[in-house]
Amino acid sequence: EASGETFVAENDACKCGSDCKCNPCTCK
């Protein structure tokens, strides 16, 4: 579950997915 929280934090910080503002986008 800890990995899940880290992923969420990383994703939220990078806003990756449908709205990727990171360039290059390092979010998985």
Curated annotation (Swiss-Prot):
Pfam families named in the record: Metallothio_2
Domain of life: Eukaryota
A single GO molecular function term of this UniProt record: metal ion binding
Assigned keywords, A-Z: Metal-binding, Metal-thiolate cluster
Family of this protein: Belongs to the metallothionein superfamily. Type 15 family.
Protein task: Metallothioneins have a high content of cysteine residues that bind various heavy metals.
Protein name: Metallothionein-like protein type 2 LSC210
